[in-house]
Curated annotation (Swiss-Prot):
Identification of the protein by name: Protein ApaG
InterPro entries membership: ApaG_domain (IPR007474), ApaG_sf (IPR036767), Uncharacterised_ApaG (IPR023065)
Biological process, per Gene Ontology: error-free translesion synthesis
SUPFAM superfamilies per the UniProt record, alphabetical: ApaG-like
Disulphide bridges: none
Highest classification ranks of the organism: Bacteria, Pseudomonadati, Pseudomonadota, Betaproteobacteria, Nitrosomonadales
Residue stretches making up the ApaG domain: 3-127
UniProt xrefs under HAMAP family: ApaG (MF_00791)
Species in which this protein is naturally found: Methylobacillus flagellatus (strain ATCC 51484 / DSM 6875 / VKM B-1610 / KT)
Tree of life domain: Bacteria
């Protein structure tokens, strides 16, 4: 793995609570997350796999690993962006996700791009 700035991706995430698919009485809280990925290095690189760590408010952790994202392994040129939306379900109204993407540059260099922790929160309703 390398920390060389030629091999770098920027990852930003936006989240949303999905009330129509959630059931509070059954402790089922559904969230979507939209991920914005940009190749900020100067070498073309392909996202090969993902590793998510999902933690609910009780500390229960679930790990999700798999090839690509939403069935794709995007190849990004320097400065190119890719965006996708996916979802997850928690047993609590609050949680956190974090992880990394495993990436291979066109020259064969492999590196991981960290996905900083982000919150999943059900909005509170005031009466």
């Amino acid at each position: 793995m390398t920390k060389d700035k030629r091999y770098a991706f920027s990852v930003k995430v936006e989240t949303a609570f999905v009330p129509d698919q959630s059931d509070v009485e059954q402790n089922r809280y559904v969230f979507t997350y939209t991920v914005h990925i940009e190749n900020t290095g100067n070498v073309a690189a392909q996202l090969i796999s993902r590793h998510w760590i999902i933690t609910d408010a009780t500390g229960k952790t679930q790990e999700v690993r798999g090839l690509g994202v939403i069935g794709q392994q995007p190849l990004l040129q320097p400065g190119e962006r890719f965006q996708y939306t996916s979802g997850t379900m928690l047993n609590t109204p609050v949680g956190e996700m974090r992880g990394f993407y495993h990436i291979t540059a066109e020259d064969g260099t492999q590196f991981d791009s960290e996905i900083a922790p982000f919150q999943l929160n059900m909005p509170r309703v005031l009466h």
